[in-house]
């Protein structure tokens, strides 16, 4: 089963969003600060962080890039 998942802050603004497949995070996900700027983004495979993950500064500019390797 596949579904779009959105998490919200108490004030109703979007906290994070991405795809859930068979109960696990899958594909591209992104998280936001309460002011709407992007905080982090990256990909999941079967619930595991993989590939390039980007952390953004308070202005939404790229702050750090981390390459995640699949375990196993």
Describe the function of each predicted region.
Residues 1-72:
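Glycine/tyrosine- and acidic-biased, solvent-exposed loop/turn segments at the edges of beta-strands
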